């Protein structure tokens, strides 16, 4: 359900604005999206895992808040990020 340290480092390297950037909204959203994707796959076989479902809902809400923040700060960064992650259809 959680992501490996190597995968997290790869996401940080891909979405970071500079070396060592782990706190930017882009990196946080990318890591949350990966965790959300993993949990979504987990629920396909564990439908009654309500404890983890609550964690999933918290992650989705956190990602939504970060996306709203990024949209307010810089519209171009927001657009490139959602295209890169494939969040909007």
Swiss-Prot record:
Gene Ontology terms for molecular function: rRNA binding; structural constituent of ribosome
Enumerate the InterPro entries for this protein: Ribosomal_uS15 (IPR000589), Ribosomal_uS15_bac-type (IPR005290), uS15_NS1_RNA-bd_sf (IPR009068)
Q: Name one Pfam family in it.
A: Ribosomal_S15
* Protein task: One of the primary rRNA binding proteins, it binds directly to 16S rRNA where it helps nucleate assembly of the platform of the 30S subunit by binding and bridging several RNA helices of the 16S rRNA. Forms an intersubunit bridge (bridge B4) with the 23S rRNA of the 50S subunit in the ribosome.
Annotated keywords: Ribonucleoprotein, Ribosomal protein, RNA-binding, rRNA-binding
Any keyword Phosphoprotein?
A: no
Question: What SMART domains does this protein's entry cite?
Answer: Ribosomal_S15
Keyword Membrane in the entry? The reply is no
What family does the database annotate? Belongs to the universal ribosomal protein uS15 family.
Q: This protein is called what?
A: Small ribosomal subunit protein uS15
Q: Name one GO biological process term.
A: translation
CC terms in the record's Gene Ontology section: cytosolic small ribosomal subunit
Quaternary state and partners of this protein?
Part of the 30S ribosomal subunit. Forms a bridge to the 50S subunit in the 70S ribosome, contacting the 23S rRNA.
């Amino acid at each position: 359900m959680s992501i490996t340290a190597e995968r997290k480092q790869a996401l940080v390297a891909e979405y970071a604005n500079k070396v060592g950037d782990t706190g930017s909204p882009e990196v946080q959203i990318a890591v949350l999206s990966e965790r959300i994707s993993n949990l979504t796959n987990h629920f396909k076989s564990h439908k009654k895992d309500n404890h983890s479902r609550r964690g999933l809902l918290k992650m989705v809400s956190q990602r939504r808040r970060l996306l709203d923040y990024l949209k307010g700060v810089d519209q171009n960064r927001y657009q490139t990020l959602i295209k890169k992650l494939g969040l909007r259809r």
